[in-house]
Amino acid sequence: MSTYDGKKIVITGGSSGIGLTAARLFADGGARVLITGRTRSTLDAALEQLGDKAVAVRSDAANLKDIEALADTVAEHFGGVDALFVNAGVTASAPFDSTTEEMYDALFGINTKGPYFTVQALAPLLHEGSGVVLTTSVVNVLGLDALSVYSASKAALRSMTRTLARELLPRKVRVNAVSPGPIDTGVLDRSLPADVVETMKDTYRSTNPMQRLGMSEEVAAAVAYLAFGATFSTGTEFPVDGGASQL
């Protein structure tokens, strides 16, 4: 019997990066996985990797109508849910004095508002004993230039983890967060010139206590632990950051 045989898992932001790696881990272990993303072509490419036990839903993580529709789709396909990984999010940087209202609203919309209402919409489908995992960030506890809004949106999510853990405790649903540090997801390679990417990676490596970048697989392993293995943990944040938040 495979590790996750019969489990039903929903992953927002599951079409690439950490979300897709986690989806692969669960699908390879026998779970049925439903992933979301904003781009149909990216979702279709993810499905090719995940196989016939996966479902892909185009959904805007900050749009309440899409979130409500997602809950209906999950109910139709799965009935109930054993684990919810709320991973959809965006990163943007700008100095404090040039940050716009549009940027502020976009980051809080996807990184904070979206996860809140996603958990609210899917909570009725969560089985007793299930796990919710939210993706925060090492920037919750670090003061970094040009990341004031992004940091705040993720810090709010960290606080939300505690409160949702308390509110869902009577239903025996655990809520925890995974906090990635500098992770090599391939996103930089696909979006920036190679020389720029290598300079950025060198900086991340040199400033990290472990002198390297993390891998998506390392974050996915932490997600799996929080979703299923951490049966006596709720309201906590699990760092996968090479010691950046502690050393």
For the regions a protein language model found, what residue spans apply to each?
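Short, small/polar-rich loop/turn modules that mediate ligand/substrate recognition or access, typified
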Residues: 85, 169, 174, 234-235
